[in-house]
């Protein structure tokens, strides 16, 4: 049957002995096997479970015991509370699971002027960008963070200072959170860059993974930088972290956490002031909980996650 093995007994009761045994089709067998596996993961909920009323009547994939999770350290797919996660970003067991909140800096002068920013330190927050940073801070008023990491580049640094205002712990600046270096394109308007360097600009916009100058591939390099940043962040003592940085490195952070390659760079978009949230198992494996939340930009929304 095309190599498909049936791992459960076929129903024989009620079949005449003289009749040949009907052989289910491959599609039927797959459906039966799917249902069998699904039923093994489902537990009918009667009344209450752990003092929480079961809304849908079904409990799916109950949380495994802590010692069971620890036995899966450093293995892909052994993450806490979910299956088939990504490869460990720490390569070592952490003392606890962690949550990381990622925020892109507020609107900057070069954002407003449609200029290529890159790693330049000349672009600063606008008045709108300052208000966006304040909105981010207000939206997270119910959240507690053990540390805040930031790019040292001015637009991200200013955003982090607003977010971390009134905290006793100092901000932690990481060079691994700096934006990608885009060489002589930095500071140019997008229109001028497209006009003066059409092939290079087209490569940057349409095939960023293969965009290169003098043999240097900024986006491919950014993937290594992002992995370095994750390791620095996750191995810091604490359980809840805030990270403030730039669009390109945020894309790399999100993609590397999800196991995506540089070719997927533009598959992720993050707005100014956009908030994304990851949960990490003890094994350093990531689960994306929220991506580019912006409700706080248009209302007084307060997050609880």
Stretches found by the model and what they are:
Residues 2, 19-37, 157, 168, ...:
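Active-site-adjacent alpha-helix immediately C-terminal to a catalytic or transition-state-stabilizing loop
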Residues 97-106:
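Short, hydrophobic/glycine-enriched beta-strand segments
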Residues 3-97, 134-202, 276:
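Phosphate-coordination/substrate-recognition cap region in phosphate-metabolizing enzymes
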Residues 106, 151-153, 176, 244-248, ...:
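Short, well-ordered beta-to-alpha junction loops that form the rim of enzyme active sites
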Residues 286-305:
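Acidic, His/Gly-rich catalytic cores of divalent-metal-dependent hydrolytic chemistry
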Residues 88-90, 262-266, 302-305:
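Short, P/G- and charge-enriched loop/turn segments at secondary-structure junctions
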Residues 110, 120-124, 163-228, 287:
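Phosphate-handling substructures
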Residues 107-163, 212-227:
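Loop-to-helix element that buttresses phosphate recognition and phosphoryl-transfer chemistry
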């Amino acid at each position: 049957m095309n190599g498909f093995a049936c791992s459960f007994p076929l129903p024989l009761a009620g079949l005449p002995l003289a009749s040949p045994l009907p052989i289910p089709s491959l599609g039927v067998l797959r459906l039966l096997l799917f249902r069998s596996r699904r039923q093994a993961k489902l537990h009918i909920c009667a009344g209450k479970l752990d003092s929480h009323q079961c809304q849908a009547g079904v409990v799916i994939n109950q949380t495994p015991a802590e010692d069971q999770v620890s036995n899966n350290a450093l293995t892909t797919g052994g993450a806490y509370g979910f299956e088939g996660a990504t490869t460990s970003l720490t390569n070592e067991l952490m003392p606890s699971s962690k949550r990381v909140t990622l925020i892109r800096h507020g609107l900057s002068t070069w954002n407003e002027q449609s200029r290529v920013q890159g790693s330049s330190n000349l672009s600063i927050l606008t008045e709108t960008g300052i208000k966006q940073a304040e909105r981010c801070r207000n939206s997270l008023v119910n959240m507690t963070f053990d540390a805040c990491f930031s790019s040292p580049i001015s637009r991200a640094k200013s955003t982090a200072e607003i977010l971390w205002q009134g905290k006793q712990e100092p901000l932690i600046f990481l060079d691994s959170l700096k934006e990608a270096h885009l060489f002589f394109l930095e500071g140019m308007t997008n229109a001028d860059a497209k006009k003066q360097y059409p092939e290079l600009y087209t490569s940057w916009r349409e095939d960023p993974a293969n965009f290169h100058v003098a043999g240097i591939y900024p986006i491919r390099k950014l993937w290594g930088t992002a992995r370095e940043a994750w390791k620095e962040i996750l191995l810091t003592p604490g359980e809840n972290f805030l990270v403030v940085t730039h669009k390109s490195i945020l894309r790399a952070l999100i993609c590397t956490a999800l196991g995506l390659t540089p070719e997927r760079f533009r598959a992720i978009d993050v707005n100014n002031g956009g908030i994304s949230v990851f949960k990490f198992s003890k094994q350093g494996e990531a689960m994306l909980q929220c991506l580019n939340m912006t409700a706080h930009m248009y209302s007084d929304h307060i997050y609880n996650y």
